[in-house]
Amino acid sequence: MATRCFWCWTTLLFCSQLLTGFARASSAGGAKEKGLSQTPTWAVALVCTFFILVSVLLEKALHRVATWLWEKHKNSLLEALEKIKAELMILGFISLLLTFGEQYILKICIPEKAAASMLPCPAPSTHDQDKTHRRRLAAATTSSRCDEGHEPLIPATGLHQLHILLFFMAAFHILYSFITMMLGRLKIRGWKKWEQETCSHDYEFSIDPSRFRLTHETSFVRQHSSFWTKIPFFFYAGCFLQQFFRSVGRTDYLTLRHGFIAAHLAPGRKFDFQKYIKRSLEDDFKVVVGISPLLWASFVIFLLLNVNGWEALFWASILPVLIILAVSTKLQAILTRMALGITERHAVVQGIPLVHGSDKYFWFNRPQLLLHLLHFALFQNAFQLTYFFWVWYSFGLKSCFHTDFKLVIVKLSLGVGALILCSYITLPLYALVTQMGSNMKKAVFDEQMAKALKKWHMTVKKKKGKARKPPTETLGVSDTVSTSTSSFHASGATLLRSKTTGHSTASYMSNFEDQSMSDLEAEPLSPEPIEGHTLVRVGDQNTEIEYTGDISPGNQFSFVKNVPANDID
């Protein structure tokens, strides 16, 4: 409730600053402003009513969106929305500080020589300087006169324009985030037809283990291996061009799907890989909509370096495009290297070629590094587009900021192109290729499985209590869950990949959030139980609990016996 109230207040503040700026602009000609004591009460009430209605409607709209996401179990998108609201609050808080500190900022005077240095536009002529000086004196109604040879640190008009920039950043951040997510989901929606093909007899025939083929004759290897892959320059040049013409094809999707299921699920298990990729994209979107302190620092650095003649605006527009192209090329190169890896391991394959993913394919063995680079590129690109429209609104389309208008058109085109390329191609490609890393993402677990595993965890703690273990002992950081099919650390959200032959979804994460829409095609209210023999290592007592039976939300878990770790093969 406090967050909602603060957001309303900051929205009111933004609107009031807009009105204040318009009033200052209209009174800059020299007419003396009247205070509230000389203003009709109906005018004050009318303006306040308008601002209150706008603020409440905006807050209610965001609240309705959050409620809809919660009802649809879109947890990742709900967290992304909360991040956006938090960032809007930060912008509102900055505006609040500027408003209450305006009278003190206007009293700060600096020498004229310092005020004439590092200007974003060319210095005005003498006639223009006199005209500008008279305008500043007329507009600075709340400031005190500076001494001779000194000027205000930021004039009142400049503070108002800074408020407008913050308002544009808030509005365009919401719009930019919405476009990014919609384009990514639109791309992944096109993969649904490929997922439906996996239920056909033709697909069953293609993955039949009794069907042997030469490796170099498979579609995946043919598309990604050729004479140019043996020469480094042509290798990366081909990967660079592929992102524009064929970023993800049907063969790529089906091959990576087959490799993921073979590594993490039981043979023959039905799994909706397209839904899983969509949820994985939502998790990635939750990251890229945030504004970290590092991104705020880049915003301040750009404002500092935006000096006339330095062409900082041009380089800041080029940088996001270069980063997005580099990341897309790297992702295409990973697909090609996985295809080459198949040819190096096998001369003959059974059914669909089995790809083996690893973090070694990514820069510094860190798949998340690519996402952080995309996060930085998206923020910079969004800010450049926002900056263009802010300059257009505040100074005009052909102002001193846009001395070369043709170059401005090129930069604007690059910004829009980078938005489409990253949202429609790079982010969906990242969500698909990173499934071939060494770690399995938590989005693989459906909601019913997550509840079953949490219940299993509570049962383990109860059993430990009955066994007279210390009450503070839990499945903590040092605990690991060992199964007959996969193993990973139980303390976090990272799941280690391992080659498996059985169920690997019977795993636990202590900080796991419920996910929506089961990927496993089972009954919605009665998910298929997980059968198997499970060993759970508890604490540092070097003991293991043996569990045999089914794991399902409705079952009670029974732990047969406590077996010393050294007695288990």
Swiss-Prot record:
It is found in: Membrane. The chain crosses the membrane at residues 42-62, 86-106, 164-184, 287-307, 309-329, 373-393, 414-434. Keywords: Calmodulin-binding, Membrane, Pathogenesis-related protein, Plant defense, Transmembrane, Transmembrane helix. Residues 1-41, 107-163, 308, 394-413 are extracellular. InterPro entries: Mlo (IPR004326). One of its GO terms (molecular function) is calmodulin binding. It is a multi-pass membrane protein. Residues 447-468 are annotated as: Calmodulin-binding. GO terms for biological process: defense response. Residues 63-85, 185-286, 330-372, 435-569 are cytoplasmic. Belongs to the MLO family. May be involved in modulation of pathogen defense and leaf cell death. Activity seems to be regulated by Ca(2+)-dependent calmodulin binding and seems not to require heterotrimeric G proteins. The C-terminus contains a calmodulin-binding domain, which binds calmodulin in a calcium-dependent fashion. This is MLO-like protein 10. It comes from Arabidopsis thaliana (Mouse-ear cress). The gene is MLO10.
